[in-house]
Amino acid sequence: MSTSRKLKTHGMRRGKNRAPHKGVKRGGSKRKYRKSVLKSRKRGDDASRNYRSHL
């Protein structure tokens, strides 16, 4: 149970914190980065959504 819980928090934390942080760090080429981020973000959202539904 502990491992499952840890994994869930880690996944959520990683997806929510990692993307915005990267964008903020790379303020210079925000426009260029945004395009790739949009694709990755969409995929991540879908994955997390499916993961949540399964749980």
Swiss-Prot record:
PANTHER family in UniProt: SPERMATID NUCLEAR TRANSITION PROTEIN 1
Residue stretches in coiled coil: none
Sequence segments annotated as region (Disordered): 1-55
Gene behind this protein: Tnp1
Tissues expressing this chain: Testis-specific.
Family to which this protein belongs: Belongs to the nuclear transition protein 1 family.
Gene Ontology cellular component list: male germ cell nucleus; nucleosome; nucleus
Name under which the protein is recorded: Spermatid nuclear transition protein 1
Record localization: Nucleus; Chromosome
Annotated positions of the Phosphoserine modification: S36, S40
Record GO biological process: chromatin remodeling; flagellated sperm motility; heterochromatin formation; negative regulation of DNA-templated transcription; nucleosome disassembly; positive regulation of protein processing; sexual reproduction; single strand break repair
General function of this protein: Plays a key role in the replacement of histones to protamine in the elongating spermatids of mammals. In condensing spermatids, loaded onto the nucleosomes, where it promotes the recruitment and processing of protamines, which are responsible for histone eviction. The histone H2AB1-H2BC1/TH2B dimer is required for loading of TNP1 onto chromatin.
Taxonomic source organism: Mus musculus (Mouse)
Compositional bias of kind Basic residues: 1-42
KW Nucleus (keyword) present: yes
InterPro entries (alphabetical): Nuclear_transition_prot1, Nuclear_transition_prot1_CS
Keywords tagged on the record: Chromosome, Developmental protein, Differentiation, DNA-binding, Nucleosome core, Nucleus, Phosphoprotein, Spermatogenesis
Phenotypic consequence of gene deletion: Reduced fertility in males. Testis weights and sperm production are normal but sperm motility is severely reduced. A significant proportion of Prm2 remains unprocessed. Male mice lacking both Tnp1 and Tnp2 are completely infertile, but protamine alone are capable of histone eviction. Chromatin in mature spermatozoa shows defects in density.
